[in-house]
Every structure is written in structure tokens, then in C-alpha cells.
Amino acid sequence: MTSVRTVSKIERLGSSLAALRRVALYLGVTIPLLPVQLVLIALHSPFARRLPRVYHRLCCSILGFDVAVTGTPSTVRPTLFVSNHVSYVDIIVLGEVIETSFIAKAEIARWPFFGWLAKLQRTEFVDRRGFRAAAHRDAIHRRLEAGDDLGLFPEGTSSDGNAVGPLKSALFSVAEDTVRGRRLTIQP
């Protein structure tokens, strides 16, 4: 015998109201922080590095994420944080744990709303076509020389996270660089 559970209208309404509440909280946090971050970037304030971490922490709280960290994130500046990319939630979760900007495909810069958020996090956008790889690698190196931590998903795409895909060597080669007179710190 098969059992089928019918979701009542009240349960659906409760779920919809909870989702609406989360969206309202998200917008209530995001909209006021946008101009603040814009000003911090314009003033070259060190807080322009810190505010995104506060923002991601608030987003994790709004979404109900309980983030557990195993190990200790590097505190050496600069650090290249390297990770598999499972979903866009990775940005929020990693952004809560580490004070970093990310390296992302150039198309994201043109996305409505989220492209703007990525720009305000000081994301380094890269064109995946090979002829621009050297220029992007140099831009990443300059950011590291300036002391910026960067997050890189070297597979260049998201996956289920169960296996490591082919690495996009042109950008990942920055890991071989000497930055500020020493080997670059890399943390998976």
C-alpha cells in the first residue's frame, strides 16, 4: 500500500511566509550595505576588505546556515585559497570564514544584481579565453602583491565536489609565484 501525504494550504503558506521573510531580511541587509561598500572602495579603506565578510556572515545567518570550520584558515597575507566549486553558496560560506575576494569568470560581472555584488566584493574577473590569460594572471599577481587574499576555484566550474576536475592551469600557475619576496601561501 502506498501512502501519499497531502501538504495542506496552511503548511504551504507557512513555508512561503518563511521564504518571504528570508528575502525581506536579505534585502534589508544588502541594500543599506551596498552604498557603504561603494564608499569604502572609493576611499581605498581597509574596511572594504572586511565588510564583505560581515555581509556573508549575515547572509549565512539569514539562510539558516550553521557553518562548521575544520582546521584554521591562514592568517598570512596574501593567501591564495583554493577550493572545489560545488554551488554559488560556496561564495557565501567561504566569504564568512575567510576575508577574501574571489576570482570569477567575466560573465558574472554582467549579471544583474549578483554581478554588482561581486564587483563590490572586489572580485577579480577573468576571461576564460586563452588569449587573455597572461593579462589576467598579471592582474591576479598584482592583487596578491597588494596583500589581497584571493579565492580561486581552479576547475573553473562547479561540480558535485566528489572528484577534482581538470585544473585551468593558466590561472592556477599564479600559485608558483613569489609574492612580496617569498613563496605564495596556498591553502586548500
Please give the residue ranges for each predicted region:
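A transmembrane-helix-recognition feature enriched in membrane-embedded lipid enzymes
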Residues: R5-A68, W116-L120
